[in-house]
Amino acid sequence: MFKVFKKEIAGRVLEVEVGKLAQLSNGSCLLKYGQTAVLVNACASKSPREGIDFFPLSVDYEEKMYAAGKIPGGFIKREGRPSENAILTSRLIDRPIRPLFPDGYRNDVQIIATVLSVDIDCTPDIVAMLGSSIALSISDIPFQGPTASVHVGLVDGKLLINPTSDEREHSSLDLVVSGTKDAVMMIEAGANEVTEAQMLEAILFAHEEIKNIISFIEEIAAEVGKEKQEVVTLEINEDFETEVRAYAKTRISEAIRTVEKLERNAKIELANEETINYFYEKYQEELNLKQIHTILDSILKEETRNLILYDKKRPDDRQHDEIRPISCEVDLLPKTHGSGLFTRGQTQVLSIVTLGAIGDVQILDGLGKEESKRYMHHYNFPPYSVGETKMLRSPGRREIGHGALAERALEPMIPSQDDFPYAIRVVSEVLASNGSSSQASVCGSTLSLLDAGVPLKDMVAGIAMGLVKEGDAVAILSDIQGMEDHLGDMDFKVAGTAKGITAIQMDIKIKGIDEPILKDALEQARVGRLYILDKMKEAISSPRPELSPYAPRMLKMKIHPDKIREVIGSGGKTINKIIEDTGVKIDIENDGTIFIAAQTQEAGELALSIINNIVREPEIGDIFKGKVIKLMNFGAFVEILPGKEGLVHISNLAHERVNKVEDVLAVGDEIDVKVIEIDQQGKVSLSRKALLPKDNDKKQDDPQKA
């Protein structure tokens, strides 16, 4: 049955069509917002996947180039691997809905959001996030939503829901919030040093709109929703669970209290092994390994959370707001342009900066208008960082997401192209990880950029906050380690300067958090961030005054846009000759700005001089050393600048009469000439005799008398 539902959001109508497209999916809907259209499908397998202890949810956000009226580039001319934006949007869709499936649900669930049409004023990511919630809510998949999502901007002190393209350009906040009616589930933000109070206000502002949208989704589900499937979960024998807990609880509790990670893991593993062996000897083949592993995992989680909530201690013996020991180093790698090593507890990140020509920027050819990215951050998480072995492959979604978060944190502090005309790439290599590696890469990036001499507007640091919540008992944790992330209820990453926040990412494993927890977490993160910044300043507190000797030297000049073709030359002949002769890189912008990247200052200045000569307009009185390129019976044509020539009339060759031009000059001769006239067509008249002394003229120029 085909139905259309409509609701106005931020002055534009959201239209939801159900029952027309993709009717074999468990749940399907077409959303139209402005001229943006996204088709979202949700499907689930008929039975649980065997032998897994996680929920197999996959989310794919498909960018179709036809949605923007484009044909894909490349030889194949069809969509290939998902873009970085598509991967980040897939993660945005995934994160708020994942906690809202029943515990123990092991059926494969797949969400596919296909962008069919794009309106730059109505971003398709938010539409896809809403569509995923609607598709799940109307399906028979056991989803405990709905959720809703909005984009929030801050323009001239005013908060805006789902800002337009122009408003986003002028916004000091780029915030995405997802939540249920009761609480916030997910936050993703980039900002230009907004305060904690402003950020909290924006999040709560978003949640009010989310509540309205959820009421709309509930109406849709009530009218066209299917009956939900029954969830098949593993049943635990209560008597057996009591027996296992009595044997293993004390052993696991003692193991958890081991401060060092590897030793703690070994003791937990030993406690589990002893428990399994004990019950295997008792029950032999009747022992259900799946049940005992599930019970042991629940004991580990409960004992860890009890330690934090009621003993007010953490597994590594820290206080709730205590940050692990920090060390910072710079200038570790002699041939790189800048490097920084940030170590926090057992998490260690080495960040390396490379400075390049403006032409090295990354071109982002997506569904919106073509853009470029001058500052790039790439995050690598090799298996050895957690003491494991694994095949090395291209970066996964997690690595791309963490890299984008650290990039967003630093981007507002990167100097403008006018102030620092370089493309900047930072690579963060995670050498060891026990939690908060993405925020360690924020700190490492700051250290390495300052070491490279990049004039950051301010230093940026990041911290990962955690949460453990049971009823009214709440513990907010600063600088969480891996175990606290895995067994806790929240991963709340906050990065910023001493003045304010530049990036936030929050994921919740429970059904949301309320305003008091958000407020306390933001304030505790601010205190921690300031502490980390002070530690970083002990290693380096300002950019180095000089760039690395191995970094390219950048020179900048401005020419009239009409002169660009002269610098490039026919088929690029002129510019390629300059590059070949000097070894520089040259980038020319449409407004006539030219950037020259050279390995040495001398090479850059030579290229600059050549370009100056190309675009220089001769004026009356200018003196040049020119080259004779053509002889005529009435005079000689002399090249005075690259691509520019003038005529020395035979009467201006010498003070004495010259019968034949060939008597005085030959093609290829280099002579000094003076500009004596420029006519209305721009033709240049030159004089040689104006620069010759009369006394010596005959001796120098009359071959018959010489």
Curated annotation (Swiss-Prot):
Could you say which residues bind Mg(2+) here? D485, D491
Concerning PROSITE patterns, the annotation shows: KH_TYPE_1, S1
Q: What is its EC number?
A: 2.7.7.8
Q: Quick one: a GO biological-process term for this protein?
A: RNA processing
Q: Which GO terms describe its molecular function?
A: 3'-5'-RNA exonuclease activity; magnesium ion binding; polyribonucleotide nucleotidyltransferase activity; RNA binding
Alphabetic keyword roster: Cytoplasm, Magnesium, Metal-binding, Nucleotidyltransferase, RNA-binding, Transferase
Q: Which GO terms describe its cellular component?
A: cytosol
Q: Cross-referenced InterPro entries, in alphabetical order?
A: ExoRNase_PH_dom1, ExoRNase_PH_dom2, ExoRNase_PH_dom2_sf, KH_dom, KH_dom_type_1, KH_dom_type_1_sf, NA-bd_OB-fold, PNPase
Q: Where in the cell is it found?
A: Cytoplasm
* Catalytic reaction list: RNA(n+1) + phosphate = RNA(n) + a ribonucleoside 5'-diphosphate
Predominantly, its location class is cytoplasm
Disulphide bridges: none
Name the coenzymes or cofactors required: Mg(2+)
Q: Name one Pfam family in it.
A: RNase_PH_C
Start and end of every S1 motif domain? 621-689
The chain positions of domain KH read 552-611
Give the SMART domains listed for this entry.
Answer: KH (SM00322), S1 (SM00316)
Question: What biological function has been recorded for the protein in this entry?
Answer: Involved in mRNA degradation. Catalyzes the phosphorolysis of single-stranded polyribonucleotides processively in the 3'- to 5'-direction.
Q: Which family does it belong to?
A: Belongs to the polyribonucleotide nucleotidyltransferase family.
Q: What is the protein's name according to its record?
A: Polyribonucleotide nucleotidyltransferase
* Source organism: Alkaliphilus oremlandii (strain OhILAs)
Gene name linked to the record:
pnp
